Amino acid sequence: MTHQYPALTAEQKKELQDIAQRIVAPGKGILAADESTGSMAKRLNPIGVENTEENRRLYRQLLFSADERIDKCIGGVIFFHETLYQNTDDGTNFAQLIKDRGIVVGIKVDKGVVPLAGTNGETTTQGLDGLSERCAQYKKDGADFAKWRSVLKISDTTPSELAIMENANVLARYASICQQNGIVPIVEPEILPDGEHDLKRCQYVTEKVLAACYKALSDHHVYLEGTLLKPNMVTAGHSCPTKYSSEEIAMATVTALRRTVPPAVSGVTFLSGGQSEEEASVNLNSINNCPLAKPWPLTFSYGRALQASALSAWRGAKSNEKAATEEFIKRAEANGLAAQGKYVSSGTCGAAGQSLYVANHAY
């Protein structure tokens, strides 16, 4: 039996667990506002807004200055490096603004995907070099949790054993480094929705990927109570001819999680994976109403599915800021209800029903 060398003190463990539980308190989820500079171009260009640092600041300000209604449905906000050091018009630091509202500040720490040689177009994620020092600095600058995204795709030949193992180990190494610096790691092994696979195939792959991740987290002595999982929902591929109900998606998703995710994990915050705003809320609601025992909070960590209507309403105009912020609040409240299984869909209306799917989505 391997000898156990304590990785974290009791105090460190308590701090990590407390942070994780605050983020996923009942009815709360995460606003993922950590789009990289390149990804912001994909958000701003379609609405005719130039992708400048100032326009990115103005847009994030519009989200972060939403009134107190979001305090009860947003438990954490994930920042991109640039955003962490930007200020509101009156000079208040964004991170401080969010913290003062009782919302936990997070930071994206990975440096993007790179090709994994010898595979059929698969990737691993870079960013471990210097991560410990960056985490120490981010902690000083107000961040209490972090995000790292690994990407896997489903095809006849993928994900390969190599890609599954490599990404699981990189996620575990990242998680371990974060915890040593007092930062709660969000573990995000995203299985892309690209392809024509059916629901069963996605469920099978999701189970294999999550099983590998939790084996790696155990091997790396990661304290599970001080982590969150950010998985894809189990859905059929975008090109699959069969359409499944939200109840079928919920059953497949909860079954996969129950088979692989230890109850010790503090929470599961789903990514929206290019679903429309409405779909993301309806599916989350069905997951919370799934008639199986669910030992973790099941909530959201949405980017596009919280922001699409707000972006459409804003279009870069100062006169539209109030309306845009209202759209964001509306989606945040909808998802806060869905996280408790209390969301009633009003049917797909306007921008909320638009698919947000991007092929081979890279941040």
Swiss-Prot record:
Record NCBIfam families: FrucBisAld_I
Originating gene: aldocb
UniProt binding sites for substrate: 56, 147
Name listed for the protein in its UniProt record: Fructose-bisphosphate aldolase C-B
Entry keyword annotation includes Electron transport: no
Domain of life assignment: Eukaryota
Positions of the record's site feature: Necessary for preference for fructose 1,6-bisphosphate over fructose 1-phosphate: 363
GO CC annotation terms, alphabetical: cytosol
Subunit structure: Homotetramer.
GO molecular function, one term: fructose-bisphosphate aldolase activity
Residues forming the catalytic site: 188, 230
Family membership noted in the UniProt record: Belongs to the class I fructose-bisphosphate aldolase family.
Enzyme class: lyase
Keywords attached to this entry: Glycolysis, Lyase, Schiff base
Segment forming the signal sequence: none
EC numbers, comma separated: 4.1.2.13
Pathway: Carbohydrate degradation; glycolysis; D-glyceraldehyde 3-phosphate and glycerone phosphate from D-glucose: step 4/4
InterPro entries: Aldolase_I_AS, Aldolase_TIM, FBA_I
Catalytic activity: beta-D-fructose 1,6-bisphosphate = D-glyceraldehyde 3-phosphate + dihydroxyacetone phosphate
GO biological process terms, semicolon-separated: fructose 1,6-bisphosphate metabolic process; glycolytic process
SUPFAM superfamilies: Aldolase (SSF51569)
